[in-house]
């Protein structure tokens, strides 16, 4: 009997044994790293040995959360990239669809390449070349997938801190690039469109596909140049991806049809909250406000000090017009600005704690994913002023879901902003819609934390590819069955041509 118990225990231990996981998250963004920290600490607490390679940001990873090791890289890359962008930003900080080019995004690829060739990364590569069971990598830049080759051809899980790109979905064989229902998130114009506007947006979809195709070609060339002619290309690297985590609720992605190899999490960082107490001055400002407070923050991805004088003046004039007090996150100098008496300016706020406060009436935001999650959780109506990336799509969803309004940052006036704040604070419907949406997001069959751990451990098993669809990572010619369509179109064309010849010649 004892022998059977020993065998049983050994089998159980074998089935539940910890894995050696490498995580590489190259983007030096506070909001991105918040999500990644929540994810890897879950894995470490589960008993897996996790090594994280990431640039330094304000986000500290808890090295006491199980077997968790961090390898720190330089963290200044993102803002330097933003400032060095070759395309002029509108009003100083607005990077709309026109700025989405292969040239601009190639700089991001080169940032990842510099990280991989940095001394800390290379030192770890030499000491642990073939010791990992799984690579977890940020989904934003596919060039980072080369780590799966460098560390011994390991299987891959990709995780996006927010929305996934069209290329991520194509890698998994999910629906993508439908210009109306599942549009490219780099667009800035959504919603009901005239016929002519619809044609222009279709052109934008095709242009974006071309730009990212050019970027993929350049990444392939760089991979061969930096890692040798035998290095795998992007298509081969993408084939190693077993699972994609998308950290938005599916309702924000139009309930896109996806295979089981794509899992929506949504609000993962909310399950890893470390309380940041409000400073005494901020707490007093919030507590003593008799009119209520509007919180204004455009995130950490762009420096608000770079906005042009016209936009800064529009914001300050709007603050002066509002019948509320204002907390404004501004990372630039204020000595050259005339700050209204009702405005408290600071370079950094404990955002979630601010939004929790009972006196906060509205949130003027760039419409980032994490900011949206925090506003919904705290039932704060939103005024979206998108500046870059997927933010225009998020702001568009505010309007569709009835939880806020969206403004065009390139044309923003003081009157527009003041009117929008008055609209979301005076109409009870916005808060009611937020309550309804929060109930929906909380009512899930499994929590984001449970899904993140369960599906990662599924990907670790030998049958980890079982979740993937046959359409995963195929090119457009194969996906559209060109081998069948081309002959059919040729026959149809020849038939019509023959009819025309008979009509006009015979």
Swiss-Prot record:
Belongs to the UDP-glycosyltransferase family. Catalyzes the transfer of glucose from UDP-glucose to ecdysteroids which are insect molting hormones. Expression of egt interferes with normal insect development and block molting. Pfam families: UDPGT. GO terms for molecular function: UDP-glycosyltransferase activity. The gene is EGT. Coiled coil: none annotated. Its EC number is 2.4.1.-. PANTHER family: EG:EG0003.4 PROTEIN-RELATED, FI06409P-RELATED. It comes from the Viruses. Keywords: Glycosyltransferase, Signal, Transferase. Gene3D superfamilies: Glycogen Phosphorylase B. Residues 1-18 form the signal peptide. This is Ecdysteroid UDP-glucosyltransferase. The keyword Glycosyltransferase applies. It is an enzyme of class 2 (transferase).
């Amino acid at each position: 009997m004892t022998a059977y118990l020993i065998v049983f225990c050994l089998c159980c231990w074998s089935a539940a044994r910890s894995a050696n996981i490498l995580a590489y998250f190259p983007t030096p963004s506070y909001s991105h790293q918040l999500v990644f920290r929540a994810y890897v600490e879950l894995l470490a607490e589960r008993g897996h040995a996790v090594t994280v390679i990431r640039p330094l940001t304000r986000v500290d990873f808890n090295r006491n959360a199980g077997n968790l090791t961090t390898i720190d890289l330089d963290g200044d890359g993102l803002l330097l990239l933003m400032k060095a962008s070759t395309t002029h930003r509108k009003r100083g900080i607005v990077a709309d669809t026109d700025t989405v080019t292969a040239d601009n995004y190639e700089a991001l690829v080169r940032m990842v390449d510099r990280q991989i060739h940095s001394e800390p990364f290379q030192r770890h590569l030499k000491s642990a070349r073939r010791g990992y069971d799984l690579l977890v990598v940020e989904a934003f830049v596919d060039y980072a997938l080369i780590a799966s080759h460098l560390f011994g051809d390991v299987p891959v899980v990709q995780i996006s801190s927010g929305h996934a790109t069209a290329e991520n979905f194509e890698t998994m064989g999910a629906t993508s690039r439908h210009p109306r229902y599942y549009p490219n998130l780099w667009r800035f114009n959504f919603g009901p469109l005239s016929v002519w506007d619809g044609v222009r947006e279709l052109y934008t979809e095709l242009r974006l596909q071309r730009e990212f195709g050019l970027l993929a070609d350049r990444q392939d060339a760089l991979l061969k140049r930096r890692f040798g002619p035998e290095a795998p290309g992007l298509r081969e690297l993408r084939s190693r991806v077993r699972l994609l985590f998308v950290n938005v609720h599916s309702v924000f992605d139009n309930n896109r049809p996806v295979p089981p190899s794509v899992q929506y999490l949504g609000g993962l960082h909310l399950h890893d909250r470390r309380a940041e107490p409000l400073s005494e001055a901020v707490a007093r400002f919030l507590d003593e406000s008799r009119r209520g407070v509007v919180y204004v923050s455009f995130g950490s991805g762009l420096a608000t000090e770079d906005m042009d004088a016209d936009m800064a003046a529009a914001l300050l004039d709007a603050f002066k017009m509002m019948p509320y007090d204002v907390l404004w996150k501004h990372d630039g100098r204020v000595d050259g600005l005339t700050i209204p008496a009702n405005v408290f300016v600071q370079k950094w706020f404990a955002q979630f704690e601010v939004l929790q406060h009972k006196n906060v009436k509205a949130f003027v935001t760039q419409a980032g994913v994490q900011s949206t999650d925090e506003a919904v959780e705290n039932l704060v109506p939103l005024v979206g002023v998108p500046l870059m990336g997927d933010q225009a799509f998020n702001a568009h969803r505010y309007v569709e879901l009835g939880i806020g309004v969206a403004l065009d940052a390139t044309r923003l006036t003081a009157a527009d902003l003041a009117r929008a704040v008055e609209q979301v604070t005076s109409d009870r419907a916005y808060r009611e819609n937020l309550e309804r949406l929060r109930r929906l997001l909380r009512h899930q069959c499994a929590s984001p934390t449970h899904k993140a751990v369960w599906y990662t451990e599924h990907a670790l098993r030998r049958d980890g590819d079982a979740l993937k669809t046959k359409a995963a990572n195929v090119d457009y010619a194969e996906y559209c069955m060109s081998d069948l369509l081309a002959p059919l179109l040729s026959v149809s064309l020849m038939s019509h041509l023959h009819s025309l010849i008979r009509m006009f010649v015979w």
